[in-house]
Structures are given as C-alpha cells and as structure tokens.
Design a protein with these regions (language model features):
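N-terminal accessory segments
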Residues: 1-152
Length: 152
C-alpha cells in the first residue's frame, strides 16, 4: 500500500521512514528489540473517528488482507513484533489518551493510548483508586488486552 496516499485520505497523521514522527514512534518502544522493527509507515489517530477512517482505508477493495497491521498502545511489551510490524502499518494509539471519571456510575473510561501513571494520578486526585499495571509508564490498552496486538 502507498502510505503516502493514505495520508491524503485520512485525517490522522501518517509518518513515513525518515520523518521526525516516524523516528519518534519507532524509537520509543520499551524494548530495544521492538525498536529494531521497521514498519513501512506509522499512523497516529487522535480520535475514534480517525481510527475508523484508517481501518476503512486499509480495507478498500484490493487491499483487504494485504496490508500488514500492528496496533500500538503504550509499546511496553518486551518482545519484537508485539506492537510493531516489519514493512507494515503501525496504528499508534498513544494520541488517544485521557481519563474520564463518572463518580455517579463509579466508572472510569480510559483512552487506548493512556498510561497507568496518568490513570493513578487522576483517580488519586479524586480520592479513588484501581489496580492495573505496576509500571507507571506502561500503556493501559496492552496490559488490559494481555499484550499488544499484532497478527503472527
């Protein structure tokens, strides 16, 4: 897939090799092994709507099943390929952050790109707590789902 063309069709930022955003995203994993994997592109949606746009674009007729995809939450899983994919597209969810507390319903909504440290801080400020990851820099989505999501 031409990821430069993807950038023209979706609202999310698309970063290609050599760009500052690409270097920041691919070089910021917890594991050095994961940092060595080189995707063909990285997309950073900032809303659910942008995630939907990206998924629709890579499922267009002729592309469905041909674009290798990895989903990145916090990027804290220690093995290569857990949240990164060689020559594929990384959907980097770190811009989908935020912690919303509904005290009446006793419910917390956590963005897919949020990290545990922010969750604990937000809840503590309101006299609340939860259990989750022990490492504050670890992403919530990956831990909740049992690791990052990349097909093997």
């Amino acid at each position: 897939m031409d990821f430069a063309a993807l950038a023209a069709t979706v609202g999310a930022k698309v970063y290609l090799p050599g760009s500052e955003g690409y270097t920041e995203s691919t070089g910021s994993y917890f594991s050095a092994f994961e940092n060595e994997v080189q995707p063909a592109g990285v997309v950073q949606p900032t809303s659910t709507e942008e995630v939907v746009e990206v998924i629709k674009a890579i499922r267009e007729p002729g592309l469905a099943g041909k674009v290798k995809v990895a989903i990145r939450g916090g990027g804290h899983t220690p093995w290569a390929g857990a949240a990164n994919i060689h020559d594929g597209l990384v959907i980097d969810l770190r811009k989908l952050a935020g912690v919303r507390v509904d005290k009446e319903k006793k419910m917390v909504s956590i963005g897919a790109g949020e990290r545990w440290g922010s969750v604990y801080k937000t809840l503590a400020e309101q006299g609340l707590a939860t259990y989750g990851g022990r490492v504050s820099s670890a992403g919530c989505a990956g831990l909740i789902l049992g690791g990052e999501l990349t097909p093997t």
